């Protein structure tokens, strides 16, 4: 699987000729991992063991100099990101009301003569306060989510293509292995025949005939007796 950067808008991918290193999220240290995710400003992003951030998002003091600036320090946090105005605006509008704000839901106990005036004041204040809420429906942060989805689809297509290539290579290797095994079995059978012939000749050799003679089976003799001998020069 080709390593790619998970930072928003970053298209860096691993290449042996590029002087860019990729660093996995410190999932074993939730406190540091949380700082990484917060620094990225990607909505609904959850890192996995396959998620990476490239070295271009870290300052020089984040690396260990004795490791050729390829190994991060334990508490290193990425800080070099390029955020668009739309993304920053979406984050600022994502939570228009701070958590400590509270709207009164019940009217205080007042004399009957002051109730109508108090209700009008509360309705006026509530109307002016809640008026900006419809803007939330058109927040541009959906653009960021769409881009994240495109990254995921692109990675999935590349993974599928890589799996198909590996399966094709595996199929070729299996066919090659089968051919070699068949060849080995043929050679083993041929070797057994040669050994059997040699053993037969050793057992059935007649000492009286000398070293130049052997006793052959009748079928082999009938097949060879019609062949003319080759005369010497």
From Swiss-Prot:
| Keyword vocabulary terms for this entry | Cell cycle, Coiled coil, DNA-binding, Metal-binding, Nucleus, Transcription, Transcription regulation, Zinc, Zinc-finger
Cellular compartments per GO CC? nucleoplasm
User: Main subcellular localization, coarse class?
Assistant: nucleus
Q: Which residues form a coiled coil?
A: 152-197
One function term, GO molecular function aspect: RNA polymerase II cis-regulatory region sequence-specific DNA binding
Pfam families reported in the protein's UniProt record = THAP
Q: Which SUPFAM superfamilies match?
A: Glucocorticoid receptor-like (DNA-binding domain)
What GO biological process terms does the UniProt entry carry, in alphabetical order?
A: regulation of transcription by RNA polymerase II
InterPro entries, alphabetized: THAP1/10, THAP_Znf, THAP_Znf_sf
Which locations, inside or outside the cell, does it occupy? Nucleus, Nucleoplasm
List zinc finger spans: THAP-type.
5-57
Domain of life assignment: Eukaryota
Functionally, this protein is described as follows: DNA-binding transcription regulator that regulates endothelial cell proliferation and G1/S cell-cycle progression. Specifically binds the 5'-[AT]NTNN[GT]GGCA[AGT]-3' core DNA sequence and acts by modulating expression of pRB-E2F cell-cycle target genes.
Question: What protein family does this chain belong to?
Answer: Belongs to the THAP1 family.
User: PANTHER family annotated for this entry?
Assistant: SI:DKEY-228B2.6-RELATED, THAP DOMAIN-CONTAINING
Q: What is this protein called?
A: THAP domain-containing protein 1
